[in-house]
């Protein structure tokens, strides 16, 4: 019997890890990866950090260059897909080539959510999703230049830190009343706000751009009435899923390809993962997780489901952010208001814990990354703690 053919569409973390997971889990059939980028699949997190700060930055490949040939994965880089061929099981490229598939994994990622007022600036306005974006930003982030960043989420703050370290004059504009409001607990939000302000970043909360004039400098008029002059304008206000191919194939979409708990779409032969995917929960709500680890996890889950294998046991959600000399790691549930703090954030070393009825459900470490491993185990096991002991620095965490 002829083995099935699996095609992966995409060139990022989820796509590469889907290929790796399929081979690791025993798939020996024909495996193809199609990407519109000419690079081998590369890591996205460094784009806002090391790619802007290092003297001679290099793209960090998700898998070694020789892995693809050694594992008999056919790479098709720099190509554009015309149709997925859901009915015919024939993927068609714009150059006329067609490729048969039995199962499909879509990991086309996402673009920056548009901001028309700034997009009208053309090349004077920047977003950050790809290696080319980072290269363009690196050229313009020069000392003493005035940089305005719209959006104080993870990407916005990482860019603010990198631009400041490149000796730019940075202002961040945020519509909400806080920074990193979507994915950090309140005490961490407060710490980050103060950290950036101490570094010289001006952060304008509860504000937005109302009018833009393009001249020698970009003139930005805010809702507050203030006018800013900028050499460089960057924005990061969320994502717009690259779902067009899926939508044209009549898959369920909602600013993302709708998947179930095993990454399967409404077509049992088509799976999706990474930033392009949005999961329908048991209660019917849609949930998207934009992180490096989620891309890896969904690739593993989809590979197992495609091969009819038991699903891997996944750790609690985890992501990290590097800002200035700080490394922050977020694990577990970030919701809730009653966070405990171990250590002193003013010394740039602390851990915030989220206890629910004594059970540890989430944590954030500040320059304490070595503690993530035991914390992960505690969250997975539902370990209970005495709050006083947990925050007592005289008691080693490993002894609890």
From Swiss-Prot:
It catalyses: 2 reduced [2Fe-2S]-[ferredoxin] + NAD(+) + H(+) = 2 oxidized [2Fe-2S]-[ferredoxin] + NADH. NAD(+) binds at residues 146-174. Its EC number is 1.18.1.3. Part of the multicomponent 3-phenylpropionate dioxygenase, that converts 3-phenylpropionic acid (PP) and cinnamic acid (CI) into 3-phenylpropionate-dihydrodiol (PP-dihydrodiol) and cinnamic acid-dihydrodiol (CI-dihydrodiol), respectively. InterPro entries: FAD-oxidoreductase/Apoptosis, FAD/NAD-bd_sf, FAD/NAD-binding_dom, FAD/NAD-linked_Rdtase_dimer_sf, HcaD, Reductase_C, Ring-hydroxylating_dioxygenase. Belongs to the bacterial ring-hydroxylating dioxygenase ferredoxin reductase family. Keywords: Aromatic hydrocarbons catabolism, FAD, Flavoprotein, NAD, Oxidoreductase. One of its GO terms (cellular component) is cytoplasm. It comes from Escherichia coli O139:H28 (strain E24377A / ETEC). This dioxygenase system consists of four proteins: the two subunits of the hydroxylase component (HcaE and HcaF), a ferredoxin (HcaC) and a ferredoxin reductase (HcaD). It is an enzyme of class 1 (oxidoreductase). This is 3-phenylpropionate/cinnamic acid dioxygenase ferredoxin--NAD(+) reductase component. One of its GO terms (molecular function) is ferredoxin-NAD+ reductase activity.
């Amino acid at each position: 019997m002829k083995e099935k053919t699996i095609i992966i569409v995409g060139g990022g973390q989820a796509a590469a890890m889907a290929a790796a997971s399929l081979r690791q889990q025993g798939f020996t059939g024909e495996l193809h990866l199609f990407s519109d980028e000419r690079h081998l699949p590369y890591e996205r997190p460094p784009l806002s950090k090391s790619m802007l700060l290092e003297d001679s930055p290099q793209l960090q490949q998700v898998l070694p260059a020789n892995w693809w040939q050694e594992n008999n994965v056919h790479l098709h880089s720099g190509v554009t897909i015309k149709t997925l061929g859901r009915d015919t099981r024939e993927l068609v490229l714009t150059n006329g080539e067609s490729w048969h598939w039995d199962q499909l994994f879509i990991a086309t990622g996402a673009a920056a959510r548009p901001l028309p007022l700034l997009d009208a600036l053309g090349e004077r306005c920047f977003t950050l999703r790809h290696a080319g974006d980072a290269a363009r930003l690196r050229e313009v982030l020069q000392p003493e230049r005035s940089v305005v960043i719209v959006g104080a989420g993870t990407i916005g703050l990482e860019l603010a830190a990198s631009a400041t370290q490149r000796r730019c004059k940075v202002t961040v504009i945020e519509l909400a009343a806080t920074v990193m409001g979507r994915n950090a607990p309140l005490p961490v939000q407060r710490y980050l706000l103060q950290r950036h302000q101490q570094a010289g970043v001006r952060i304008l909360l509860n504000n937005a751009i109302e009018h833009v004039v393009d001249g020698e400098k970009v003139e930005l008029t805010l809702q507050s009435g203030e006018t800013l002059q900028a050499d460089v304008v960057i924005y990061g206000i969320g994502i717009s899923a690259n779902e067009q191919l899926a939508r044209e194939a009549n898959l369920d979409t909602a600013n993302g390809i709708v998947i179930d708990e095993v990454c399967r779409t409404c077509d049992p032969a088509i799976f999706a993962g990474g930033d392009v995917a949005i999961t329908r929960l048991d209660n019917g709500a849609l949930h998207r997780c934009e992180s490096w680890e989620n891309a890896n996890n969904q690739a593993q889950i989809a590979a197992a489901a495609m091969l009819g294998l038991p699903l891997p046991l996944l750790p609690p959600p985890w992501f990290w952010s590097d800002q200035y000399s700080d490394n922050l790691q977020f694990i577990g549930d970030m919701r809730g208001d009653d966070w405990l703090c171990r250590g002193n954030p003013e010394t740039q070393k602390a851990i915030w814990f989220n206890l629910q009825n004594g059970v540890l459900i989430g944590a954030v470490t500040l320059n304490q990354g070595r503690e993530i491993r035991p914390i992960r185990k505690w969250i997975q096991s539902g370990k209970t703690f005495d709050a006083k002991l947990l925050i007592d620095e005289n008691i080693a965490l490993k002894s609890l």
